[in-house]
Structure formats: structure tokens, C-alpha cells
Amino acid sequence: MAPTLNAPEQIYADSKFGDTVFPPFSVDGKTITMTYNTFENRYEAETNHALRHQAAEVFYAELARHRHVTASAYNSRVQQEKIEATLRGYDSVFSFLLADQEVPRELYDRQIDVIMQDLAPIMQKYARLLQRVYGLSSMTSYDLKLELDPSFVSTISYTEAATYIKDGLSILGEDYVQMLSRAFDERWIDYAENVGKCTGAFCAEVYGVHPYILSSFNHRMDEVATLAHELGHAGQSVLTCSAQPYLNKEMSLYMVESPSTTNELIMENYLLQKAGDNKRERRWVLSQMLSKTYYHNFVTHLLEAAYQREVYRIVDRGGSVDADELSGIYRDVLTRFWGDAVEIKDGSTLTWMRQPHYYNGLYSYTYSAGLTVGTQMALRLMASSEVAGKADAASGKACGSKQNEVGQNDRSADENHVGVSDRQTVVHAWRSFLSAGGSLDPIAQAALVGVDITTDKPLKETIAYIGSIVDELVELS
């Protein structure tokens, strides 16, 4: 049955990678050729306004040519899920899809509703900052991927990226660094950028062997975070497969992005430390945290999740969807989130054609769910490392009793910090989380690291943290 049941996703992939070809176009007398990868990795954030907008128009015009077959494939998929939900006795397609994730409906709805309400004004503030920095007469949806500092150029070789990642993630333990070394040395990673190559970055788990990573390394410093992200999946895979039997190897979809996003944030905080007092470099790192890590997981995928929810509501009522209706739903979601801060271009309403995630049930919302736990964990790991570093420095100047006094002073100075003796405890808890695989449901798994996802507290704290990043970026700009 697999070829039949998987046909919608295969049709989507064949259309995207086999039939979607972008014609050359000219800007300022120069002929530009473009692929899916070069649009998403280069032209979408191009600082030349004319080139960026023309690339977007060409990109979405080509997507529009395939919108009906893509919509038909997607409608087939969601209808299939609804039929299966009914046959299995579920009261809704939501209950059916969330059962596999082992989370109640309220966690799913809360993730979407709270972010749409609380994060929207923060991101609108960021959009206005971009508009001011670039001197744009109007801020459009084609401008949202712009870098905050267009003249800050930071390139890195693949070998240098490997060194940065091993150094930055050393907080997770010596054997974790050894795993990272194996990934680079034994060529687990396909990093070359090639025509026809699948877009994005992915990690494939192979039980009993090792993971494989697909990426397109473009020698930009932000690729360090992307590689760290995928290596987060790889590290979780290695630890899970060594601790769990085959049937328990798969972590709930709700939690699957936590290991990856935690790695991203650890790396970005590592880069912040290296920036030191250099305000411009600090601004660049903070902008990467916002525009890459949080924008990707809390905005791009969350807006997709809000769109998906509307589609499944229609399907649950016995309806179906076509290309025009899908674009209309997406426009409404974009408009609700960005308000009057951003003009929504027609092409952006075709964003529903860009992701394969929709063929994997309620996947998109889990990026923000995973990053919520990831943020809480990364902050604790970084705090434990910082306090341990202070105590280690103090140990060279004081006797044992004085060391204890310093540790107590550090602990009382910041309630979020843990003492040096707790650093290993924090890391051990996180390693237990990574090793759990599918042996625990998400609520119990989050509890391993002291995060209670039955409340909105972790989510609201994460949104507040994002807000603090935007505030500092405004101050530094």
C-alpha cells in the first residue's frame, strides 16, 4: 500500500524537483539564473531591491504554473488522512494525527493561538526595524528575509565551520564532540550545492549504522547554525539508538525539533561570546538568532501550522480545497500575523507550495514546540556553563571555603543560573532527554529537563526572550 498512500507526496516532489524550472531573467542588464536552492539561500535575502523583488516574481510565477497539480496532491493527502481517521474511529482528523504524537489537542491549539497573538506584535516591530534600516517606502512580504546588517560579510570554510561547531557544542560532553568529529571525518554530511538537489537540510536516521545529513553549505557564517541544527538531530539519533530498542527509536514528532534547535541556540550563544564587546558583531549574531532560528521555527513554520489548521477544519467538515482556496487561507494567515506592518504580495500567498512538511500531518507546529523546549534547555545549559566558568576562575584565587562562597554568590545573583556542581546535572538531564527516544510521551520527556509543557509558561517565556532580542536589535541599530 505504501506506493499508493505515499503518492501525494511523491507527486508533489516530482512536480517541485522535476517540472519546476525557473527561466533566466535580467536585472540591470545582467542575466540571472536561479534554482530553488539559490532563491531560498541567496536571492530571497538579496540586498539589491530590484533583484530581490524580480527574483521573487519569477520564482512565484513558476510556482503558480504548477499550483493546481500541487493543490490536488495536497487535497488528496488530507482527504486520505480524514478517511483514515474515520475508519479508525477518531472524532476528528486532529485527534487522529495528534494521537501518534501523544499530545492533547489543547497543546496543539495553544501553540498556534499564543504565538499568533503574542509574537505577532514583536515581529511587526522587527519588520518596521528592517524597513527603517533599508529605507524602504513600504515593507512587503518579499523583504522579510533581509539581513539586518547588509554590509556585514562573514564567510567561513566547511573545515572552519566544523571546528566552530565542535568547540561550541563541547558543553555537551567529550563523547558528543567525538560523535561530531566522526560526522565530519567519515562524511556523514552531503554539503555540496548542486542543481536539482533537494532544498533545505535534513537528517536521516539509520538504526544500527549512523545518521546521514543533507545540506547545501554556502560558506556563510549562518550555515554554522544550520549544520549544528542537523547535527542536533544526528546526536539525538546516535544517543537514542544506543539506548533504545528499534521500536522505541522514534521521538514524538512534538519533540523532534528540540535537540536540533537547542544546538542552534548553543552555537549562537557561543558566537555571541566570541563577539565580546564588538557591538556590530553582536548585532549580527542576534539578528541571525532572530532571522534564522526564531523566524524559521516560530514564524515560517508556525504560519504554516495556522494555515494547516484551517485546511483540516475544512476537511473535518466534509469539504475539500483547491489552489485558490489554499492561497486565500494563506493570505488571511499572513495578514492576521503581520497586520499593517507588512504588505502581503500575491506571490507570498503561494508559500503553501514550498514545503513538503504538509504531507507529514501536523508537523509544522512542532518546530515552535520543539524550540520552546530547546530555548529553555539552551538557556539552562549556557547558564550552567557560565556559572561553572566563574567558579573555575575563582578556584585559582581562593581556597576551598572561598570557592563555596563564590558559588553561593553566583547562585543568588541570578535565579536562572545553577552552580558549578549542577553543570553536569543539567547536561546529564539533557542527555537523558536525547536518549529517551519514543520511550516517553512529550509531557514526561519535557519533565526530564524540568520543563512543564502542560502550561503556557515555557512558551510565554520563550516569546519574551524573542522580544528581548528584538529590543536589543532596535537599541543597537
Where are these regions (language model features)?
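His/Asp/Glu-rich acidic catalytic environments and adjacent acidic regulatory segments
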Residues: 1-106, 110, 114, 167-168, ...
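C-terminal, non-catalytic "cap/extension" segments appended to globular domains
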Residues: 139, 227, 235, 273, ...
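A metal-dependent hydrolase signature that marks the N-terminal structural subdomain at the beginning
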Residues: 93-94, 100-175, 409-411
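Short pre-active-site segment immediately N-terminal to the catalytic Zn-binding motif
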Residues: 156, 208-227
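Active-site metal-coordination segments of metallo-dependent hydrolases
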Residues: 247-259, 293-296, 323, 360-367
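Post-HExxH zinc-binding segment in Zn-dependent metallohydrolases
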Residues: 251-280, 296, 370
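Catalytic zinc-binding patch centered on the HExxH motif and its immediate surroundings
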Residues: 154-156, 189-209
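Active-site recognition of the HExxH zinc-binding catalytic motif
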Residues: 89, 218-238, 260, 370
